[in-house]
């Protein structure tokens, strides 16, 4: 059986086109209980697998001179609503989120990150993560 290095092909194509950054990897956990909008863009529902594969992908990109943008901080796996069309609202406790969806973002580092356009009611009830100073500051201070 022939194995194809898809990651390598993408890196070569990006470099050929003069692109030096890619919005990967998706660190969101797959949640089979939801009609998860992240779907197969997630590596797994298991955070250890997501962390391991994400670190490998980031290392490969950096070794090739490309930068990565981890996404969707602090996590998009716990909602079934596509944030491109409506504002998802999550009512889960901060403790639950820290031990599940937010966990991968604490273990994987990248210079750049894309926030999740989600309202986490138990963290900041008035602003979605993209606009929440509290959530962004918490991420910067490694509270997630």
Segments from the language model and where they lie:
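Enzymes and membrane/adaptor proteins characterized by extended Gly/Ser/Thr/Asp/Glu-rich
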Residues: 1-49, 78-90, 116-129
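Second-shell residues forming the walls of enzyme active-site clefts
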Residues: 49-144
